[in-house]
Curated annotation (Swiss-Prot):
The lineage of its organism: Bacteria, Pseudomonadati, Pseudomonadota, Gammaproteobacteria, Pseudomonadales. Belongs to the AspA/AstE family. Succinylglutamate desuccinylase subfamily. Its EC number is 3.5.1.96. HAMAP family: Arg_catab_AstE (MF_00767). Binds 1 zinc ion per subunit. It comes from the Bacteria. This is Succinylglutamate desuccinylase. The keyword Metal-binding applies. It comes from Pseudomonas syringae pv. syringae (strain B728a). Transforms N(2)-succinylglutamate into succinate and glutamate.
Length: 335
């Protein structure tokens, strides 16, 4: 196997490869772009016009998707996978990966769409570098651009695998992309309705990619992800890489769709959730329930029918989102 197939091993060791560019026996070029970054380019005659960005490890302790990307990279380096797409593999936060931590000082996935310019430190610099790598990769005109940013969650979920679809003014969410997500094993998709500062929102908003944050189960240490079922996603990614996707219609039967009702913002250190510490994502909330409280008598009361909570985290920094209230929606407004 080519040495660049060991990108994860190099990244965890903090080492650069001796050779920055290598070719497989099929003529696929693998090029080391920097720490945790590998570009894969098929021979020109096999290139099908797809640019696929696959990122994981934005949170360093979310190891199942990191291991999945490692397996795909190794398969390409061995010649088992024969790409027809250009691919950029990114391990988002190498320092946190080496520590087995979500982040070191700052959550990298709150530093995109220019937010890193308002901050400092190594993780702000890393977010800037990830934006640069993505922008360079997606700079070729007239190509199909797709980005999957792969995560696992810090808590359990009543819907284990789901996606978040970013928003941009004047741009419709795609039924065909949602159908692909369903085939990849996603049971639900949250359709966002405002700008965001996560990685997939940057590539969607600024670079014109179809982009998604995929939540794939519970976060566990390296080597302990046997319970995370990534089989359907892996098949989907292999098909995208090799250009062998079957034709599929835009039938969304069985895919649950949600929209954002409100974001819960933590204003002060007095903020508290009236939820159990182990509450799961997508837990239902009764209308009239006092969800959260903050200083000055501020209260978050559930007003929506069918509301659920995702990503509740009272320990975020003041001014950041501490949770999202979501409600069921349908596919009537999709493109």
């Amino acid at each position: 196997m080519l040495a660049l197939g060991k990108l994860l091993e190099l990244t965890l060791a903090g080492r650069e490869p001796a050779e920055k560019t290598q070719l497989t026996v099929e003529g696929v070029r693998m090029r080391w772009m920097g720490e945790g970054a590998l570009e894969v380019r098929p021979p020109e005659a096999r290139d099908n016009g797809t640019d696929l960005l696959l990122s994981a490890g934005i949170h360093g302790n979310e190891t199942a998707p990191i291991e999945l990307l490692d397996e795909l990279i190794r398969s390409i380096a061995r010649g088992d996978l024969k790409p027809r797409a250009r691919i950029l593999f990114l391990f988002g936060n190498p320092d946190a990966m080496r520590r087995g931590a979500r982040f070191v000082e700052q959550d990298v996935n709150r530093l995109f769409n220019g937010r890193h310019l308002q901050s400092g430190g190594a993780e702000a610099l890393r977010a800037c570098e990830l934006e640069r790598l993505a922008a360079s990769f997606f700079s070729l005109p007239e190509r199909y651009r797709l980005h999957y940013d792969l995560h696992t969650a810090i808590r359990g979920s009543t819907i284990e695998q789901f996606a978040l679809y970013p928003w941009k003014e004047g741009r419709q969410h795609s039924r065909l992309e949602l159908a692909r997500l369903r085939a990849a094993g996603m049971s639900a998709v949250l359709l966002q309705n405002k700008p965001s500062i996560v990685f997939s929102a940057y590539t969607y908003d600024q670079l014109g990619a179809e982009a998604f944050t995929l939540e794939l189960g519970k976060a566990r240490p390296f080597g302990q992800n046997q319970q995370v079922n990534l089989g359907p996603l892996r098949v989907c990614l292999e098909q995208l890489i090799e250009g062998t996707e079957p034709e599929r219609d835009d039938d969304l039967e069985g895919l649950q769709l949600f929209s954002v009702a409100r974001e819960v913002i933590k204003r002060t250190d007095a903020f508290t959730f009236n939820l159990a510490d182990d509450v799961e994502n997508f837990s239902p909330l009764e209308k009239g329930y006092v969800l959260a409280e903050d200083a000055g008598g501020s209260r978050w009361v559930v007003e929506e029918e069918g509301a659920r909570i995702i990503f509740p985290n009272p320990r975020v920094k003041n001014g950041l989102r501490a949770g999202i209230l979501i409600v069921p929606t349908d596919a009537d407004s999709l493109g």
